[in-house]
Amino acid sequence: MEANGSPGTSGSANDSQHDPGKMFIGGLSWQTSPDSLRDYFSKFGEIRECMVMRDPTTKRSRGFGFVTFADPASVDKVLGQPHHELDSKTIDPKVAFPRRAQPKMVTRTKKIFVGGLSANTVVEDVKQYFEQFGKVEDAMLMFDKTTNRHRGFGFVTFENEDVVEKVCEIHFHEINNKMVECKKAQPKEVMFPPGTRGRARGLPYTMDAFMLGMGMLGYPNFVATYGRGYPGFAPSYGYQFPGFPAAAYGPVAAAAVAAARGSVLNSYSAQPNFGAPASPAGSNPARPGGFPGANSPGPVADLYGPASQDSGVGNYISAASPQPGSGFGHGIAGPLIATAFTNGYH
């Protein structure tokens, strides 16, 4: 994609990538040129750079551009005006933010997520089971504050990272005659890059947590970055425009499509290797492949955020993968508290 700048500008989107005076201008008319864009915004302050993004093949405007003011205070003036119209079309100026580096998945850690625990399993059972692999520093189950019953999942912290590798290589373990799933715990920032939650509030509660955190690991930060209908420009940038309708400039957000198709079931998408229908609470039927149905909601990020829970858990969630059996008897809403194995930290 090309950027056509007005006279006296470089026309490069990278020249001022860290400039607080840079703004993203969306909703431009196809007839709007860099000159007319500059003329309009010059009333708010001196403009150092102005450009309209164009398709490299057709040379037609893509309906958006950038304006960089010499004084960042001019940005506040623009935002202070509730309505902007250029070439008989309402436009939408927003602040342009440099895209943050994507957090990397943790490959070495001492903490694991354990999901699918039976209702009668207690924290001592979990600790005792995993001690056969190595010394356990900490073990905890996540509890529902209202019912005071655990939600079927928790965390175990080992003394040695190599033990985690061994435990997760086995992946499925049997505790109290119930198959449970073990995965490396990931920092919350990895699963929910900055900005994804803020742009997801229009989605259902479970959709927010699942689609933006675990169901779309192949598309991290897909809402927070600049590619929301404007692919291929200024690769070092992310542009945030809260309240800006996604469908106005590009395809409908993938999460909304998934919601329309009903692909989320109890916070888990239906997986080809596991049964999709939800099971009634407490029924815990057998599933294809020999695994009984799980009773826990699994790793949903919102379950680890409340202030009431243990500080050692709040920054971790499990990496995404389906539990053996997608039907869960418990709902996922509701605050959680953690009960921890006493080791000097709790």
UniProtKB/Swiss-Prot annotation:
Phosphorylated. Ubiquitinated by the RHOBTB2-CUL3-RBX1 ubiquitin ligase complex. It comes from the Eukaryota. SMART domains: RRM. Ubiquitous. Expressed in proliferating neural precursor cells. InterPro entries: MSI_RRM2, Nucleotide-bd_a/b_plait_sf, RBD_domain_sf, RRM_dom. The modification Phosphoserine is found at residue 6. It is found in: Cytoplasm. Residues 21-111, 110-187 form the RRM domain. Induction: Up-regulated in astrocytes after brain injury. Belongs to the Musashi family. Interacts with RHOBTB2; the interaction is necessary for MSI2 ubiquitination and degradation. This is RNA-binding protein Musashi homolog 2. It comes from Mus musculus. The gene is Msi2.
